[in-house]
Amino acid sequence: PVRLEKVRGEVRFDGVDFDYDSTPPGSSKGASKGTLRGIDLTVPAGGSLAVVGPTGSGKTTLSYLVPRLYDVTGGRLLIDGVDVRDLDFDSLARAVGVVSQETYLFHASVAENLRFAKPDATDEEIVAAAEAAQIHDHIASLPDGYDTLVGERGYRFSGGEKQRLAIARTILRDPPVLILDEATSALDTRTEQAVQEAIDSLSAGRTTITIAHRLSTVRDADQIVVLDGGRIAERGTHEELLAKDGRYAALVRRDAHLAPVVPAV
């Protein structure tokens, strides 16, 4: 296995296919949910990519391939030019951080839950990460602060709070590549704003791939890709895709429940 000492964070999908049941490409069997076909994409180090598309288009599957939760069934996925299948486990684990829709908290203190990401983190580092993730004030208001027990028999955090704890964990880990699978659950406006500010703190200076379920958060991405049936249907910036008036523009209209979108001149 290859050990990457210093990860810049370029991510490249080179003709990537993926099948949950490993149906050979080109077979007559219809594309199943989550199948990917012929994905060619490069996200430069420090760049941002947003992936959008209807349910079952393969968005979340795409995010699973970078940290090797699944392996590609065709083509290659490269980090800094190295196939992820050739990287040693430590290099890959240090290179890629994932903030998923599901955040698991252990029956332990808040501090221990955060320290899971970096066992040697100092108290100061934990507080700084929580502040960046917009969750410090809430933790500080709990009866035992960072020593408050959480989990099944302890304090129960809300969905938005859990998400910010996951972001704080990832800030502590400091990975060069970030995979962000947005929560589909509805958050109130204030919570959503806090979560978005936490995400902005986290993604600054990192290669960020966002699996977007709401389009309001993707317009600033360097590159937006629309997946449909496991293939790339459109790609470009927010403005370019609105001007095309294709699938992305239709998704934006549906998302905003607005009249036809007129791109800014």
Which role does the model predict for each range below?
Residues 2-265:
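ABC-type nucleotide-binding domain
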